[in-house]
Structures are given as structure tokens and as C-alpha cells.
């Protein structure tokens, strides 16, 4: 999923987790016992889509195209041979899974499946691996220094990143419940983008009132049974990381770019005011 790397996430990671050496690169297996009842492979959701639930988009991000080749089977994934991670077209790892020059320690290339439906298929979005996240930070200008980030820190950062996205989707589903009648199949995610320094009007108003600015912002575009809807997500520092890898306070709401979104915001504001 998103490759946005926020400085607060790296600096506040202090949770007690299994050592990163216990979470090594694993390759996909040909038959996962947990998923054999649905499909051969590990793990892919193969339920047919409902043709009445909106149109699909054909624009698939490059890092999602072959993502399921790197989703680890929870039971048998660790037993697979590393050679299965190679791209059969050139017998090389995909570029975004390649260790960076002078990288101080190895990182896992295993990717975790999210609970977020992809609008272009019957599959779910897949989160980046530790190696992909490291490479993304380097592309954004970050440089590793001694004792800056450890192997264990990268393990924790990925868990925090994934948990943030799962929580954001849960908040979106709460808003989308207002439209359950018109879209009974539920929403799916089309695309998303980071806008860390493009503060939303709501965030700026809060700042003028004395509150801190968010350390990150994402815009998520969802498919509501054929209608594109944009959500704004502001990320605020919530303090110490807990055992569930949560430290971020999320402010999730539909963007005020349609009459439907304005009406939703007004209804929810009224309910909160009168409850």
C-alpha cells in the first residue's frame, strides 16, 4: 500500500516486538492450508465480484501488479525457497525489492495483505515490504546513519504503517454506512496519495486555534458503486506506540467537493452536536 514514510513514526517506535531476525524474507507457497478451500495459492481472495456493484478501473499501480507473489502464507511461507522471489522474466528481484547499495542489514520482502478492497479487481490492496519501505525513504532523500534505524525498527515501522491504513479504512466505512442503501456491496479503494505539507483547511483552522498541525495527510479516492468519492485523512501524533502499533490519531472525512459530501458532513456534525 502507501509508501509514505513519516519522521514521527520512525522516532517514536519503542514497542516490544519479536526481533527482526525472526521475521526474515519468505516466498509464497503453492498451497496455503488456510486458503485451499477457495483457491490454489497463498492467500488470494477469489470470490466473484457483483456486477451490480459499480464499474472497475484498469489503472493498477505498478507495485500492486505482482504483489501477491510476495504475500506470505502464515503457516508455510517461511519454508519456501528464496529463488521463488525472482522475476521469471529476468531472474532478478523486482526493482523495488532490491536491497539498496551499502544497506546495513537485510530486510524482509514479505508483503501483508490488507482488508481494503481494490477497485480494479476482486483482490485486496497489499502493503509494502520492509525493503520497499526502506527504498521509498531513500528515494525521498533520507540517508541512513549509524544507530539511526535498526532492523527491528523497520519491522515496527511497517506494523505502524499498516495499522494506520487499516484504521483509516474503518473510519471511511463508518461514513460510507450513510450510503448503504445506494451501494449495498460497499466501497473499494481506487487510488491514494500523500500530501504531507498541503494542509487541509480544517487542519489550518485547528492550528489557528492553538492545536498542532498534522504530521501527514493522505487523500483516498474510493469507488462507491460507480461514483468516485474523495476522503481527506489528517494524521496527528497520539503519543507512545501501544501494543497494537497505534500511536496516530486520524481525522477522516469526505472532502467538501460535492453536495453529497457537504450533506454527509452536515448530518454527522448535527448528530454529534445533539447526541
From Swiss-Prot:
UniProt-annotated stretches for the region Disordered: 1-59, 83-102
What Gene Ontology terms describe what this protein does at the molecular function level?
Answer: holocytochrome-c synthase activity; metal ion binding
**HRM repeat segments:** 31-36, 41-46
Lipidated positions (N-myristoyl glycine) are 2
What EC number(s) does this enzyme carry? Answer: 4.4.1.17
Q: Give the subcellular location.
A: Mitochondrion inner membrane; Membrane
Q: What class of enzyme is it?
A: lyase
Q: Which UniProt keywords apply?
A: Heme, Iron, Lipoprotein, Lyase, Membrane, Metal-binding, Mitochondrion, Mitochondrion inner membrane, Myristate, Repeat
Top-rank taxon, per record: Eukaryota
**Which cellular components does GO assign to this protein?**
mitochondrial inner membrane; mitochondrion
Residue ranges annotated as compositionally biased, kind Polar residues, are 9-28, 48-59
Q: Does the keyword Iron apply?
A: yes
Q: Where are the transmembrane segments?
A: none
Give the record's membrane topology: Lipid-anchor
Q: Which reaction does it catalyse?
A: holo-[cytochrome c] = apo-[cytochrome c] + heme b
Transferase is among the record's keywords: no
Assign the protein's first listed, main location to one coarse class: mitochondrion
Q: What does this protein do?
A: Lyase that catalyzes the covalent linking of the heme group to the cytochrome C apoprotein to produce the mature functional cytochrome.
**Annotated PANTHER family:** CYTOCHROME C1 HEME LYASE (PTHR12743), HOLOCYTOCHROME C-TYPE SYNTHASE (PTHR12743:SF0)
Family the UniProt entry places it in = Belongs to the cytochrome c-type heme lyase family.
| Official protein name in the record | Holocytochrome c-type synthase
Amino acid at each position: 500500500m502507501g509508501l509514505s514514510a513519516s519522521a514521527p513514526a520512525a522516532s517514536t517506535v519503542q514497542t516490544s516486538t519479536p526481533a527482526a531476525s525472526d521475521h526474515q524474507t519468505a516466498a509464497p507457497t503453492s498451497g496455503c492450508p488456510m486458503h485451499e478451500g477457495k483457491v490454489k495459492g497463498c492467500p488470494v481472495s477469489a470470490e466473484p465480484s457483483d456486477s451490480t456493484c459499480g464499474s472497475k478501473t484498469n489503472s493498477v499501480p505498478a507495485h500492486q501488479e505482482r504483489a501477491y507473489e510476495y504475500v506470505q502464507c502464515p503457516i508455510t511461507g517461511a519454508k519456501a525457497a528464496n529463488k521463488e522471489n525472482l522475476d521469471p522474466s529476468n531472474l532478478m528481484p523486482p526493482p523495488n525489492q532490491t536491497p539498496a547499495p551499502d544497506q546495513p542489514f537485510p530486510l524482509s520482502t514479505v508483503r501483508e495483505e490488507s482488508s481494503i478492497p481494490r477497485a480494479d479487481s476482486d483482490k485486496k490492496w497489499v502493503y509494502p515490504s520492509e525493503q520497499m519501505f526502506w527504498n521509498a525513504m531513500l528515494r525521498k532523500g533520507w540517508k541512513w546513519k549509524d544507530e539511526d534505524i535498526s532492523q527491528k525498527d523497520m519491522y515496527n515501522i511497517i506494523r505502524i504503517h499498516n495499522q494506520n491504513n487499516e484504521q483509516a479504512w474503518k473510519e471511511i466505512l463508518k461514513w460510507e454506512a450513510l450510503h448503504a442503501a445506494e451501494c449495498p456491496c460497499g466501497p473499494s479503494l481506487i487510488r491514494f496519495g500523500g500530501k504531507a505539507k498541503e494542509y487541509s483547511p480544517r487542519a489550518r483552522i485547528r492550528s489557528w486555534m492553538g492545536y498542532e498541525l498534522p504530521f501527514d495527510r493522505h487523500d483516498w479516492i474510493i469507488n462507491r458503486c460507480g461514483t468516485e468519492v474523495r476522503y481527506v485523512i489528517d494524521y496527528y501524533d497520539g503519543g507512545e506506540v501501544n501494543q497494537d502499533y497505534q500511536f496516530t490519531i486520524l481525522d477522516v472525512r469526505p472532502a467538501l467537493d460535492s453536495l453529497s459530501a457537504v450533506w454527509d458532513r452536515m448530518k454527522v456534525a448535527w448528530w454529534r452536536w445533539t447526541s
